[in-house]
Amino acid sequence: MITKTSKNAARLKRHARVRAKLSGTPERPRLNVFRSNKHIYAQVIDDVNGVTLVSASTLDKDFNAENGSDTAAAAKVGELVAKRASEKGITNVVFDRGGYLYHGRVKALADAAREAGLEF
């Protein structure tokens, strides 16, 4: 019998393949994106030391929007994570889309982070 794998299981396999080749360093940390049905999260991670340097999400107290699951909210999270990263002196990052397609909310977050000063 043919079984169909869930979308999230397929995404996790894609993410594992990408993570095998991609890691963040202290000089160029990894900007990781996680997308749920209601919210979006972004973290800047130093994989060598295993430390999250900066994070932002639609659940933050600094974030005030009615809806956390649209592209406008994702763009605000991108601006917020870029602002927090620049305060810590981080300008160059490696973008990790987390196995998601580079489209919609993930693309909006990435574009807003680029416009706010992050380079990737």
UniProtKB/Swiss-Prot annotation:
UniProt keyword list: Ribonucleoprotein, Ribosomal protein, RNA-binding, rRNA-binding
GO BP, one annotated term: translation
Disulfide bonds: none
Transmembrane segments: none
Xref: Gene3D superfamilies: 3.30.420.100
Coiled-coil stretches: none
GO MF, one annotated term: structural constituent of ribosome
Cellular component terms (Gene Ontology): cytosolic large ribosomal subunit
Pfam family of the protein (one): Ribosomal_L18p
Described function: This is one of the proteins that bind and probably mediate the attachment of the 5S RNA into the large ribosomal subunit, where it forms part of the central protuberance.
Family the entry assigns: Belongs to the universal ribosomal protein uL18 family.
HAMAP family recorded: Ribosomal_uL18_B
PANTHER family: 39S RIBOSOMAL PROTEIN L18, MITOCHONDRIAL, LARGE RIBOSOMAL SUBUNIT PROTEIN UL18M
Oligomeric and partner information: Part of the 50S ribosomal subunit; part of the 5S rRNA/L5/L18/L25 subcomplex. Contacts the 5S and 23S rRNAs.
Protein name: Large ribosomal subunit protein uL18
Originating gene: rplR
